[in-house]
Regions:
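Conserved N-terminal entry element of GNAT/NAT acetyltransferase domains
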Residues: 46-57, 77
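Helix-loop element at the rim of GNAT/NAT acetyltransferase active sites that forms part
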Residues: 53, 63-81, 97-99
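Conserved GNAT-fold acetyl-CoA-binding loop/helix
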Residues: 71-94, 105, 139-140
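Conserved beta-strand in the GNAT
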Residues: 108, 114-123, 159, 164
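Conserved acyl-donor/pantetheine-binding loop and adjacent beta-alpha core of acyl/acetyltransferases
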Residues: 123-158, 162
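C-terminal "cap" of GNAT-fold acetyltransferases
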Residues: 139, 192-206, 210-213, 218-234
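Conserved acetyl-CoA-binding loop-helix of GNAT-fold acetyltransferases
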Residues: 165, 171-188, 207-211
Length: 234
């Protein structure tokens, strides 16, 4: 049966199940009889994946991905312990300006209007200032004026705070592409060093960072855990 061509009809649909290779299908068009036909996730990524600055309406998904990426650090930043409260607090910070978690500091990977990956970036020299609104809320919540956050970034570095890809889309190069977007932003702003932290018990992530040219510079502690501070010279 001849397929009828359609334009920009790509969208997820429950009609298509994951096949044996775990390739989710998207609607690409419809046959003359009205049945949908699809294309694989890899094909749709190649055709439709875009990178853009985050906007406030991305808050819910952004908070979810940040939480997945930073795990227990999210509890320290928010002063919350329940998942829903952690994500709500982070989403609120995301919608605001001039803080570490703000939409202003994020690039998202957008696939057909859905956020499938994020990277948070900012200059190391503004890290302390970006933490101030978070610390203010933490100190008020805990009634403790001596709460501090660990220093994560060196001055003079363009810092990758967080990178995360939706688990449905991992293994398809999106993480690497997000890191390249961060590198591009650093170069455009005149920075010669790109830096990030990776937990020492996360060799898979470290291998990814090494693949784009990052090298271990030193070891620091974040939330009492050891991290390798990695740097790429641009």
């Amino acid at each position: 049966m001849k397929k009828k061509a359609t334009t920009k009809r790509h969208k997820q649909n429950k009609y298509f199940e994951n096949d044996s290779d775990e390739n989710f299908y998207y609607i690409a068009g419809y046959t003359d009889g009205g049945a949908p036909y699809g294309i694989t996730r890899e094909e749709i990524i190649a055709q439709e994946l875009k990178f853009r600055g985050a906007v406030k309406k991305d808050a819910r998904k952004a908070a979810e991905l940040i939480h997945i990426a930073i795990a227990d650090i999210a509890e320290k930043l928010t002063g919350q312990t329940k998942k829903e409260n952690i994500r709500e607090t982070m989403a609120n910070f995301f919608r605001e300006e001039n803080n570490r978690l703000s939409y202003q500091n994020m690039i998202v990977a957008d696939l057909l209007g859905e956020v499938v990956g994020i990277v948070i970036i900012y200059p190391g020299e503004v890290a302390s200032r970006l933490d101030e609104p978070i610390l203010k809320q933490l100190r008020k919540k805990r009634r403790n004026e001596v709460i501090f956050l660990d220093k994560e970034a060196d001055e003079g570095d363009f810092y990758i705070d967080t990178v995360c890809v939706d688990d449905r889309f991992r293994g398809r190069g999106i993480g690497t592409m997000l890191l390249k977007e961060a590198e591009k932003a650093a170069s455009q702003k005149g920075y010669s060093r790109l830096s990030l932290n990776v937990a020492q018990d996360n060799p898979i992530a470290k291998k990814l960072y090494e693949s784009i040219g990052c090298k271990k510079d030193k070891v620091i502690k974040i939330n009492e855990h050891p991290y390798d501070y990695m740097v790429k010279i641009l």
